[in-house]
Amino acid sequence: DAANFNIPKVLEGKSFLPVLLGKKNVHKKYVYGLMTTKGINNGSKSFGIRSVRDDRYKYIWNFTPDIEFENACTHSLVFKSWIKKAQAGDTDAKERVRRYQWRPEIEVYDLKNDPYEWNNIAGTEEVKKVQNRLSGALKKWMKSQGDLGQETELAALERQRRGKKKGANKKSNKS
């Protein structure tokens, strides 16, 4: 848009140019996020996360809270140092490790009062309406993207390999 290029209709999205030019202060009502551990280095077998946030609150849906969350970070020296401290009795380190690896199904954070997302207020009366609104917005967005939640997560490897020739990732033994 900024380059005055004719944008093909097949491309989704909304121009950010009015915000850059100072004609608007807000781009969209919500920001959506998604993440998977399926097929990533040191990832859990399948731990999908979807999220939505507005200008104040963030809603996170962890599809498999009964599975330990793992990724490259959990194998890092920093994370291993937290584990070591936790095992030595450091209650703060123990709580950080637990919270990172064992996530509840639903998380809601008040980003104004809790910018580091430490106090999960999901299910509390004070945010019941907010939680329902954000949950509805996330489910509507997921539907618009063809995202079936855990079913989509379980099929993640198929999407990651799309367009690759068989054996393309195999290393050659030739010298």
Regions found by a protein language model. Name each.
Residues 5-107, 162, 166:
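C-terminal cap/loop subdomain of S1 sulfatases and analogous C-terminal strand-loop tails that border
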Residues 89-106, 111-175:
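Long, internal low-complexity/basic segments
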